[in-house]
Amino acid sequence: VINASDDPLVAEIWTSDAWQAYPTVQTGEHQSTFTEGHIDYEEKLQSIFSVVPIEQQESIIWSVKNNGNAKSAIAVISSNDKTQKYRVAIEWIEQQGWKPVQVEVLNTLEGTY
């Protein structure tokens, strides 16, 4: 679903019931982390890039951070040339992994992370 946005920073908002959690290999109690190279962080990135039309190796990751609680995160990413800009929200689903919940197509990177 594509919706318009009232936010001047956001061109449109994408959501989809078809988006699935990125399958986790983590076991035991989930600990959210934002340390590059940690399995939880890498799974966050896999989930984020599964719903945008750019490849991780052709992108700039501006921020990945907590989105209000330990079971949610938000990232701002762009293509290397900065023509494609996105803010992606994900949520942790127990025993499944990180699931994308919303993509905002950004008009600008300024003030978005």
Where is each model-derived feature located?
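Aromatic-enriched hydrophobic runs in primary sequence
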Residues: 1, 44-47, 90
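Short charge-dense sequence patches
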Residues: 1, 35-41, 98-100
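Terminal targeting/leader modules
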Residues: 1-4, 24-30, 55, 94, ...
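N-terminal, intrinsically disordered, polar/charged segments of Gram-positive cell-envelope systems
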Residues: 1-25
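A broad structural signal for short, well-ordered beta-strand segments within beta-sheet-rich domains
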Residues: 5-12, 54-61, 100
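Mature extracytoplasmic domains of secretory-pathway proteins
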Residues: 24-82
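Extracytosolic low-complexity repeat regions of secreted or lipid-anchored proteins
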Residues: 64, 68-108, 113
